[in-house]
Each structure stands twice: as structure tokens, then as C-alpha cells.
Amino acid sequence: MSKRTFQPNNRRRAKTHGFRLRMRTRAGRAILANRRAKGRASLSA
């Protein structure tokens, strides 16, 4: 039996999918712009 692949960790979640990471790159800012345009309640982790 293999282990479960999702091992929740809030710090890792924020570091890989967080708002500050999204703001760092041009592509990340594009993602945020798309999510704002769509009207998402939460923009990032």
C-alpha cells in the first residue's frame, strides 16, 4: 500500500500557492487578474 499523497501543511501551502508568490511573477499577477475578473471570493491560498 502506498501512502496518501496529500499531507496538509499550511506553511508549504502558502509558500507554493500564496498571494505573495503570485504577486512575485508576471504570470502570477495574470492569474490574480483573471480570478478578480471572474469574481472569485478567494484569490489565493
From Swiss-Prot:
<comment type="similarity">
    <text>Belongs to the bacterial ribosomal protein bL34 family.</text>
</comment>
<dbReference type="GO" id="GO:0003735">
    <property type="term" value="F:structural constituent of ribosome"/>
</dbReference>
<protein>
    <recommendedName>
        <fullName>Large ribosomal subunit protein bL34</fullName>
    </recommendedName>
</protein>
<dbReference type="GO" id="GO:0005840">
    <property type="term" value="C:ribosome"/>
</dbReference>
<dbReference type="Pfam" id="PF00468">
    <property type="entry name" value="Ribosomal_L34"/>
</dbReference>
<dbReference type="InterPro" id="IPR020939">
    <property type="entry name" value="Ribosomal_bL34_CS"/>
</dbReference>
<dbReference type="GO" id="GO:0006412">
    <property type="term" value="P:translation"/>
</dbReference>
<keyword id="KW-0687">Ribonucleoprotein</keyword>
<dbReference type="GO" id="GO:1990904">
    <property type="term" value="C:ribonucleoprotein complex"/>
</dbReference>
<keyword id="KW-0689">Ribosomal protein</keyword>
<dbReference type="InterPro" id="IPR000271">
    <property type="entry name" value="Ribosomal_bL34"/>
</dbReference>
